[in-house]
Amino acid sequence: MPIGVPKVPFRSPGEEDASWVDVYNRLYRERLLFLGQEVDSEISNQLIGLMVYLSIENDNKDLYLFINSPGGWVIPGVAIYDTMQFVQPDVHTICMGLAASMGSFVLVGGEITKRLAFPHARVMIHQPASSFYEAQTGEFILEAEELLKLRETITRVYVQRTGKPLWVVSEDMERDVFMSATEAQAHGIVDLVAIE
């Protein structure tokens, strides 16, 4: 039994014969992108590169970003969000499974009116966490200041993209807030819930 990423036939425009490419490359060529893991620098750079390349290739054709992510690192997540705002094509975001933490931040960054959740998807928002638990006092204070700046940035993006008041978003980010697809729609994180 083969293990790994499946290969599918793909014929490039103007070519007679199809070549075998892995399924993700085939889907990328159709402008379908996937965030199906924890957000880190590697996946962030891959998605940023794909979005920039595909927008250069055709800046009128929308991109579709499917999200099933438990969250991850803040800076790589913000980089994905910023790129989505920068590229010319609209970026549709589709939550399937779970969009938690930075996954939900990327989800809310989709083009407004083009953010979707599957009916059984879950969304979770909370405040960013620190990684310096054993740091020296000076480093810890600097880390805390930076964390407060990041929290403010993330909160303001949620306020802007959801239409919710600052006090509501700030209160929700105090703890882990899990939502169903319809609750995420009511919260303004997604615009549509797919029909079963």
Curated annotation (Swiss-Prot):
GO terms for molecular function: ATP-dependent peptidase activity; ATPase binding; serine-type endopeptidase activity. CDD domains: S14_ClpP_2. InterPro entries: ClpP, ClpP/crotonase-like_dom_sf, ClpP/TepA, ClpP_His_AS, ClpP_Ser_AS. The keyword Transport does not apply. GO terms for biological process: protein quality control for misfolded or incompletely synthesized proteins. Its main location: plastid. The keyword Cell membrane does not apply. Disulfide bonds: none annotated. GO terms for cellular component: chloroplast stroma; endopeptidase Clp complex. Cleaves peptides in various proteins in a process that requires ATP hydrolysis. Has a chymotrypsin-like activity. Plays a major role in the degradation of misfolded proteins. This is ATP-dependent Clp protease proteolytic subunit. The lineage of its organism: Eukaryota, Viridiplantae, Streptophyta, Embryophyta, Tracheophyta. The gene is clpP.
